A protein has these predicted regions:
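Short, small-residue-biased leader/transition segments that mark boundaries at the very start
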Residues: 1-13, 212-216
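Short, solvent-exposed loop/turn and secondary-structure capping segments
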Residues: 31-34, 42-45, 59-60, 176
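Short, charged/polar micro-motifs that form catalytic or ligand-binding hotspots
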Residues: 15-19, 30-35, 66-70, 131-135
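A conserved hydrophobic secondary-structure block that centers on an alpha-helix together
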Residues: 18-19, 38-42, 47, 51, ...
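Active-site cavity-forming subdomains of large catalytic enzyme subunits
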Residues: 47-155, 160-168, 202-204
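Alpha-helical support elements that line or immediately flank enzyme active sites
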Residues: 18, 24-41, 81-87, 143-152, ...
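Catalytic cores of carbohydrate-active enzymes
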Residues: 59, 146, 150-211, 215
Length: 217
């Protein structure tokens, strides 16, 4: 359990959760939790925020209470935003949003935001592994952050994150109709095989990542 301090004259205690396999669970499991067990979903979100305040960043893929960076994206963000938009974060949404904004703007081992913002994507000659997947999934996290910023009336932040949410378009190759790796000069990766399970993607190929590409609309 974690203590959230005094609420009125009573100490507020909530269940604490860890070992968030967020790359695997943010799409379906966590949205389902908000419908079936909303009180637990709220506690999970609180645990993610507490993790950020203790470690500096929202959890990515934790094990035994520690971040191991084995997966990509910052998918605590869509989980928190989904919970907020469903009314499960009522006590301090500004605290939740601050955790999101800092995690998406302060670089850490798994996310080099300076490179991301300089090029508008992750170039494969700088970010050697999973550059396509990292770009697409980061753009989706940015879109979710934009939704919360808009809901909180933070228009400047909304515009910032919506611009980033469009970065996925920079890796769309019109000639092949596929998402495709691009280097820091803007050149497409060659050779290119849409069916290849290459280093450009995480647990899939460019064909897999093109059809359900996270959108900014």
């Amino acid at each position: 359990e974690i203590s959230l301090g005094l609420v009125g004259s009573e100490m507020c205690i909530r269940d604490s959760y860890s070992t968030f396999s967020l790359w695997d669970t943010y799409r379906a499991a966590h949205p389902l939790y908000t419908l079936l067990v909303p009180e637990r979903a709220g506690d999970m979100v609180e645990s993610m925020i507490a993790h950020k305040e203790a470690k500096g960043f929202l959890p990515i893929w934790t094990l035994w209470g520690k971040e191991n960076y084995c997966m990509i994206g910052n998918h605590a963000v869509p989980v928190i935003v989904d919970a907020y938009l469903k009314g499960l974060i009522t006590s301090d949404p500004e605290r939740a949003y601050a955790a999101i904004k800092e995690s998406l703007t302060l670089s850490q081992l798994n996310s080099d935001w300076e490179v991301y913002d300089k090029y508008g994507y992750y170039p494969f000659d700088i970010i050697e592994k999973e550059s396509v997947s990292r770009t697409l999934e980061s753009a989706y996290d940015d879109y979710c952050a934009a939704l919360m910023a808009q809901a909180l009336g933070k228009e400047e932040d909304y515009r910032f994150f919506m611009k980033r949410a469009g970065y996925y378009q920079n890796l769309f190759d019109k000639q092949t109709g596929m998402m495709r790796g691009k280097d820091s000069t803007g050149s497409w990766r060659v050779p290119f095989n849409m069916f290849s399970l290459s280093h450009a993607s995480s647990h899939g190929g460019c064909l897999l990542y093109t059809s359900p590409s996270p959108r900014d609309r």
